Amino acid sequence: MAEAVRRDWQVTVFNRGVHGRVPDGVHRLRGDRTAPDGLAALTGGEWDLVVDTWDGAPRAVRDAALALADAVPHYVYVSSGSVYAPPVAPGSGEEAPTVPADADGDDGDYPANKAGGELAATRVFGDRALLARAGLILGPGEDIGRLPWWLNRVARGGDVLAPGPRDLPIQYVDVRDLATWLLDRGAEGVGGAYNVVGRTGHATMGDLLDAAVAVTGSDATLRWTAPEPILAAGVEPWNDLPVWIPRGHEYRWLQERDVERAYAAGLVCRPVTETVADTWRWLREVGRVPDRAGRPARAPVGLAPEREAALLAALPA
């Protein structure tokens, strides 16, 4: 929404209207897409483009797409790389098999919900549906808290458990670069599935954490540690140490997807230093990672201080 407003587009949002506010000039339609007649507010409207981020029951995407079938020429569905069926080989592209899903399905697990949402959007809009399989999303406004956790931890200073190797490539997309690509390609009428995330190695764990030290002005010392002792201590990649997935891990493919199709379609990713600096600026403005409005709470990410201290104490001097 912020990128569309920045472009001076006429923007309409559809939601229940019980959380947050919308920028001046944005028209809000109220409704509950899971309720009977909950899409009534869409009746009679016409738009140039729809962007749907729904991650619940696929039938809600189906119903919204059907309600908008004659009101909009193009449907953008923000999906996820989680739709791919395990095991996923590193380097896989959009042709990789997806998890079993049903366009008419009720709320299930996240991969099936997103895969079902893709089926629903495609059933109604065909090749006029753009399926953006986003990867790890970082940047200002991140309400999961992965990069904010690292920034807050580094800002506290002292020895920081830095999961290695330092040159481990990471794969993510800045939310603003994702938004730009979605609106550009949506306006052009592009359809089909795309892995929308930066190239593996656009940045490394070292680049990310060095940038965190720089922007916070912290006296933190990054204690780079090989994966083996970290994993042996029961630390979970991705959750306990956000962003980090070491080589050889079953979910390493999340950091090694083929994204050349999205790049050929104009994806441009800003430097990691900009993403980190702008996220820190936003985090200082809001004070803490905001609650996920209208969505189930997620388990907190990041190691507890006492657990990190114990791990650091066990490392060789």
Enumerate the predicted regions with their spans:
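Substrate-positioning beta->alpha
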Residues: 144-150, 163-188, 192-195, 207, ...
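N-terminal Rossmann/SDR dinucleotide-binding element
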Residues: 1-53
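Conserved beta-loop-beta element that borders a ligand/cofactor-binding pocket
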Residues: 117-141
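NAD(P)-cofactor binding segment of oxidoreductase domains
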Residues: 45-101, 105, 115-120
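Mid/C-terminal beta-alpha module of Rossmann-like enzyme folds, strongest
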Residues: 184-253, 257-260, 278-280, 285-317
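Conserved sequence/active-site signature of Rossmann-fold short-chain dehydrogenase/reductase
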Residues: 83, 137, 201
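Active-site YXXXK catalytic motif of short-chain dehydrogenase/reductase
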Residues: 110-114
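A short C-terminal helix-loop "cap" of Rossmann-like NAD(P)-dependent dehydrogenase/epimerase domains
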Residues: 151-163, 218
